[in-house]
């Protein structure tokens, strides 16, 4: 992974309003691989049943997908995302999403993404497909 691309993505995540709102941190970034983390805050992310809102868990998944899919320095956008919600995290759980590229063609790339809590319990798993535009990321 080019250090210029890595630094640009790290800085973009630090500035991103969505990541700031949910306290998402980028822990690791390598070619086609990303690890992000947030603490599930029930005051921000509960649903009507006082459990984690699926959108909050998906937001963490999307952050891992977004960062892993940009590592070649070009814009990639989501084409398809399939999420299985396996378990609901406990309140204030530290959630970690890890995205790994599993396939790549000239125009697409596939990613497996898993969300676990701090005890290693699987919260959600995801398969995502990105469209690779070939255009450079604008914040380089």
What are these model-predicted stretches?
Residues 38-40, 85, 132:
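Hydrophobic residues in beta-strands and at strand termini
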Residues 20-22, 32-34, 75-81, 93-95, ...:
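A generic structural signal for short beta-strands and their flanking turns/coil linkers
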Residues 21-51:
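Catalytic strand-loop segment that frames the active site of acyl-thioester-processing enzymes
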Residues 48-62, 66:
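Compact, glycine-rich, soluble single-domain proteins
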Residues 1-3, 90-96, 100-140:
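HotDog/MaoC-like acyl-thioester-processing domains
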